[in-house]
Structure formats: C-alpha cells, structure tokens
Curated annotation (Swiss-Prot):
Single GO cellular component term: endoplasmic reticulum
Gene field: nSMase
One record GO biological process: sphingomyelin metabolic process
Protein name per its UniProtKB record: Putative neutral sphingomyelinase
Species in which this protein is naturally found: Drosophila melanogaster (Fruit fly)
Source organism, top-level taxon: Eukaryota
Ranges where the record places region Disordered: 309-330
InterPro entries: Endo/exonu/phosph_ase_sf, Endo/exonuclease/phosphatase, Sph/SMPD2-like
Site positions per UniProt: Important for substrate recognition: N177
Entry binding sites for Mg(2+): E46
Length: 442
C-alpha cells in the first residue's frame, strides 16, 4: 500500500555575504525555481544572511508554507528547511569539533555547524529530515580538517539513530563535503545503515565543468567535478522506501543570465513509501531502489533497512548477488559488519594521529609563548630611542597579544579540541567493540 510520495531537494546556495558572486540575483532565481511546486521538502545550506533566509521563506511560502532556520554560532548554522507539510518539531545538535576560530578565512567555526532535524508530518506518517553541512576541505593534499569531518560524520549517524524513533522515513540531505571514496562518507553511511540515493559515476555536484563558478584550477584538478552533495535514505520499521528517481533538476544557467544558480548543483530524489506486513522470520524494513540511469536503463536493488540486523546467512547470500551499478544503487549495499569495521578502524587511526598532533601543537605553542615572554622582558628593560617610543610600545602590545594567543591555544583550545576528538574516538570504540556481538541493535 502506497503511504506517500515525496520529492526531496538539497542545495548549497553559496550565500556568503560580500563574498559570493551574484548572490542576490541567484537567490531570486532559486526562489523562483523552488516556488514552481516541483518539490515537497527542500534542504538548503550556506544560507548565511538573515535577509536571504527571509527572502527564501517568503518567496516560496505559496507552495512551501512551512519552514525552519537553524540558528547557531556567530553567523547561524546556515541550514534552512522548506516544506510543503507541517513541521511538528525541530532539534539542532552542534558538533564537538568544527574547525578553528583563528582560521577566519575558513569561517566554519563561526557558523557553529551541526545537524538539524525537522519532524515533518506527511500524510499521517512522520518523516525525519536531517540537514547537515560538514566542514569544508580546503586543501586535499594537506587536509587538516579530515578528522573533524570524520567525527562530524559519525556524530551525525549517531544523532540519526538516537532520534529516529518510530518515524516512517529518515532522510539526510545536505552538503557533506565527502566523496564516496572518502572515509567520512563511509563512516556516515556504514554506521547509520542509510542508503545513498545515487551511485552513478555520471553525476557530479560541485566543481562541475559546466558551472560558471568553477575555477580553472578546479577544472584542471577534477575535470569531471566531484559529488559531495547527497541525499541518504533509511526506512522505518514495516516500511519499504522506493527511490523512484534521482537527478540534478536545475538548469546549467539561471534563465536569461550567464551565471549558474550556485557553485554547487541541486540534487533531487523522488521517494515512494509503501507499507509492509511485518514478518517475524525476515527483516521487515527495507530500502528498494528502482530508478532510471542516464542512458535510460533501469535497475532494482533491495537493501536491508533501518532496524534490521544482518545475520551471517544474510551476509553469505548477499555475496552471490551480482554487483549492480546504477543511478539508485548505493555503496551502502556493502555496509556489512566487515565494511563498517574497516571504516571505523581507519577513523580511529585518524583520531589517534590527531591526538598526537594536538600534543605536539601544545608543546610548540607553549615554547613559542616562553620565547616571546623572554623577548617581552627584554623589550621592557630596553630603553627606546628618541622618536621610537610609540613604535616600541605598540611592539610590546603585539608581543603580549601573541603570548596570550599562544597560551590560549596551548591550554584552553587544545583541551577543547582534544576532548572533542577523544569523545568521538571513544564512541567509535564502543560501537566497534559491541557491534558484531549485538548486531541486531546496530
């Protein structure tokens, strides 16, 4: 029996005030597209300006009358949800690690990033929509935020598990800054047992060649672009969720203009929910995929869903299934205990490396503070030449300020980040230790 049908859309709108190009005309164009009535639930990221949030809500209220913006940090979390159906409850969970406050040019810390939950009532069924925007990757060769994203991914998976309750469907839609081969993607998908609505190499959502905002360097680095914007799905008990369609629905350019809607591509998934009769001897919650790929062919995949354990017999039978690559299939088809264990072990190794680096950083900051303190004492004892007193006084204030910064980074900030990483590491160890023995509960 068909319970409901939903069109879910996610888009990073690139709405950074004074930085993002063509921001106002792009927001207007996005409003017009969302007001077309094609989408039932919309998950937006990087809505950093209050005026943009209000414009998006007001411009779409005729077809998406229910909305919620998640406030957090200095600038707001940048997360906005628009819905055709009533939003009965909301909850925001801030991540324990989220970049560095002194990296002003990156600004992730100021957003107070986390995962936002909207409990939406659709046709008598409770749907949980999770909106998230993981920490950005600024340097692929030297990614100092990799551990932060891994912990954010694991934290998000645990948040989804802890809050899913008796919801018929859980949807995570957002900019996860993680490609399918990345460890943060694997940790999130394998530990949450969600399904990626896309598994086709033909889709890219960022740094795309046709996007007007893709730089020449990005095109040279990734000629085809990357896929970091995702819609993950997980069915509730006694529910079969069919992913009927996956596509990038927006045109390449804003109509009548030479620029794109955003530096990211919008992603849409069409979902159908069916009620299943529970069976005591078989798993009951499933995810079924039956959707079109780019060349027009179809594929069908059934995935064990939210509340089900994978027994050894299930695992063995799955090994005889042919590998299917299609628009709606997912690497989470392989999210068996072995794959989850491998992902967690890799994540734990990253956490250990980060903890060692934090210890080294603490020593370096204290050493720098000690050296600068000696320099400050010498400056105090030194008599400034005539005409140089103002400069010397300013120099003393600068040195004193740097000393305070080094002491803060070596003590308060170092312990804050250490505890954040340590908490994530301990939580992963708990799952790794108990998951295989108590697989039913994971």
């Amino acid at each position: 029996m068909l319970l409901l049908e939903l069109n879910i859309l996610t888009l990073n709108i690139w709405g950074i005030p004074y930085v993002s190009s063509d921001r106002r005309p792009r927001i207007d164009a996005i409003c017009k597209e969302l007001a077309s009535g094609k989408y039932d639930i919309v998950s937006l990221q990087e809505v950093w300006a209050q005026e943009d949030s209000e414009l998006l809500q007001k411009g779409t209220e005729a077809v998406l009358p229910h909305s919620h913006y998640f406030h957090s940090g200095v600038m707001g979390a940048g997360l906005l949800v628009l819905s055709k159906y009533p939003i009965l409850g909301t909850l925001f969970h801030a991540w324990s690690v989220n970049g560095y406050f002194h990296r002003i040019q990156h600004a992730d810390w100021f957003g107070g990033k986390g995962v936002g939950l909207c409990r939406i009532l659709v046709g008598g069924q409770m749907v949980h929509l999770y909106n998230a925007h993981l920490h950005a990757e600024y340097d692929n060769a030297n990614d100092e935020y990799k551990t932060h994203r891994v912990i954010q991914a694991f934290d998000t998976a645990q948040f989804i598990e802890a809050t899913r309750g008796n919801s018929a469907l859980q949807i995570l839609a957002g900019d996860l800054n993680a490609q399918p081969q990345d460890i943060s993607y694997k940790v999130l998908l394998y530990t949450s047992k969600m399904l990626d609505s896309c598994d086709s190499d033909s889709f890219r959502t960022n740094e795309c060649e046709h996007n007007s905002y893709t730089s020449k360097q990005a095109r040279e680095r990734n000629p085809l672009g990357i896929r970091i914007d995702h819609i993950f799905v997980r069915g509730g008990d006694h529910v079969n969720a069919e992913i009927a369609e996956y596509k990038l629905p927006f045109p390449e350019r804003v109509p009548g203009e030479k620029f794109s809607f955003s530096d990211h591509e919008a992603v849409m998934a069409k979902l159908k929910l069916f009620k299943l009769e529970p069976r005591s001897e078989e798993p009951v919650a499933t995810i079924e995929v039956n959707c079109l790929v780019e060349d027009g062919e179809t594929c069908s995949v059934r995935e064990v869903g939210a509340g089900d354990a994978l027994t050894g017999e299930d695992d063995q039978s799955s090994q005889h299934q042919p590998e299917i690559q299609c628009n709606g299939s997912s690497t989470s088809i392989q999210s068996m205990p072995a794959a989850r264990t491998a992902a967690l072990l890799e994540a734990l190794a990253l956490c250990d490396a980060s903890l060692l680096q934090l210890n080294t950083d603490r020593i370096l900051y204290y050493s720098a503070a000690t050296f600068l303190f000696v320099l400050l004492v010498l400056l105090v004892e030194f008599t400034a030449p005539v005409g140089m007193r103002t400069i010397f006084l300013l120099l003393k204030f600068i040195v004193f300020g740097v000393i305070l910064f080094c002491v803060f980074m070596a003590s308060i900030w170092n312990y804050m980040e250490r505890n954040g990483v340590l908490q994530g590491k301990k939580s992963m160890e708990v799952m790794l230790h108990h998951a295989q023995k108590y697989e039913y509960f994971y």
